[in-house]
Curated annotation (Swiss-Prot):
GO terms for cellular component: plasma membrane. This is Multidrug resistance protein MdtH. The keyword Signal does not apply. Residues 1-12, 117-138, 186-213, 265-276, 321-339, 389-402 are cytoplasmic. The lineage of its organism: Bacteria, Pseudomonadati, Pseudomonadota, Gammaproteobacteria, Enterobacterales. It comes from the Bacteria. It comes from Salmonella gallinarum (strain 287/91 / NCTC 13346). NCBIfam families: PRK11646.1. PROSITE patterns: MFS (PS50850). Keywords: Cell inner membrane, Cell membrane, Membrane, Transmembrane, Transmembrane helix, Transport. It holds the Pfam family MFS_1.
Length: 402
């Protein structure tokens, strides 16, 4: 086995272990934020939505800067620094009793993510061969789902005692992750050339095809982020207990572990990437529309199942397509910019979703936010269809098995 092949194989295992630690640290804390501050402390949902939207926008919106800096200086220093910064954000969140302190903690957490997320994504593109990326992204997403359940279970259990324990656990996990990277991650360069920060950013911004694709995905993310805001609140409202939220993530884990890899393996040889992405988005949009009209957990969990199945179909295709479109001369910059759709869509989804949720309650129209999200999903579906029908993306990137 050549040294390059050996590095790729070892890199896969490193990426899987690193991803599990990050997912556990994140999901111990974030699914419980809306329950802690809306249901337990009585804050308006829009206040928590601002905090979550701020974290999302800082992490993903500034990702191009984090990626460009990583292109210049390498992945390791950015990843370690970012993970320590997120640990500090979680520690601050544990003592948040005013909105401004929650917002500050989410700002720190998002800034940390800006530093570590793009280089971690670029490492996947660097280490995994193009023909294997779809399946590897599926493995990462299966891991995400399992980690989400374990993290949510642990966080829900700790929340019975003290929210500070929840935040401390998340902080400790990110400190461990920083140490793991500092110890084992080689000083790899992300790009094929040592790209200056400004040049990497310029290269991305001049790629109109990639920019259009990324911005179109903002609507997709407005739906996707509700697993952190409105869906946990809805489950808690109907069940009357925050403990029920863990079952929402258990559903996601079961569906992901049983369906994600087989669907990706079966569909990658039969359907183009954009068709898989659009099909998943359509299922997600349809499942959103009736959520505000359900009256029991069985109906709600059925719709959540449909939503997750749509995500299982769409996510591997979305990640693979984003990676395929990245220029090897500026991988960090491309993977950083690819998060801008999540920054915009996530911020609008959190803040707008929280505002619509409060408005729906005030007007006695609980279906309002869900109907709006479904409509946004359909508009995004049509926009993606228009984009791909005009062949703005090279055919070789989209063919099955590409």
């Amino acid at each position: 086995m050549s040294r390059v092949s050996q590095a790729r194989n070892l890199g896969k295992y490193f990426l899987l272990i690193d991803n599990m630690l990050v997912v556990l640290g994140f999901f111990v804390v974030f699914p419980l934020i809306s329950i802690r501050f809306v249901d337990q402390m009585g804050w308006a949902a829009v206040m928590v939505g601002i905090a979550l939207g701020l974290r999302q926008f800082i992490q993903q919106g500034l990702g191009i800067f984090g990626g460009a800096i990583a292109d210049r200086f390498g992945a390791k220093p950015m990843i370690v620094t970012g993970m320590l910064m997120r640990a500090a954000g979680f520690a601050t969140m544990g003592i948040a009793h005013e909105p401004w302190l929650l917002w500050f903690s989410c700002f720190l957490s998002g800034l940390g993510g800006t530093l570590f997320d793009p280089p971690r994504s670029a490492l996947v593109v660097k280490l995994i061969r193009p023909e294997q990326r779809g399946r590897f992204f599926s493995l990462l997403m299966m891991q995400d789902s399992a980690g989400a359940v374990i993290g949510a279970l642990l966080g829900s259990w700790l929340l019975q005692y003290d929210f500070r324990l929840v935040c401390a656990t998340g902080a400790i996990l990110f400190i461990l992750c920083a140490l793991f990277n500092a110890w084992l991650l080689p000083a790899w360069k992300l790009s094929t050339v040592r790209t200056p920060v400004r040049e990497g950013m310029r290269r991305v911004m001049s790629d109109k095809r990639f920019v259009t694709y990324v911005l179109t995905l903002a609507g997709y993310y407005m739906l996707a982020v509700q697993v952190m805001l409105m869906l946990p609140i809805m489950v808690n409202d109907i069940a009357g207990s925050p403990a029920a939220v863990k079952w929402m993530y258990a559903i996601e884990a079961c569906l992901s572990l049983t369906l994600l890899y087989p669907i990706a393996l079966w569909s990658e040889k039969r359907f183009r990437l954009e068709h898989r992405l659009m099909a998943g988005l359509l299922v997600m949009s349809l499942s959103m529309l009736p959520i505000g009209m359900v009256g029991n957990l069985q109906q709600l969990f059925t719709l959540i199942c449909a939503f997750y199945i749509g995500s299982v179909i769409a996510e591997p295709a979305r990640e693979t397509l984003s990676a395929s479109l990245a220029d090897a001369r500026a991988r960090g910059s491309y993977m950083g910019f690819s998060r801008l759709g999540l920054a915009i869509g996530g911020a609008i989804g959190y803040i707008g979703g929280g505002w619509l949720f409060d408005m729906g309650k005030a007007l006695a129209q609980p279906e309002l936010p869900w109907m709006m999200l479904g409509i946004i999903g359909f508009i995004t579906f049509l926009a993606l269809g228009w984009q791909f029908s005009h062949k703005r993306t090279p055919r070789r990137m989209l063919e099955p098995g590409a």
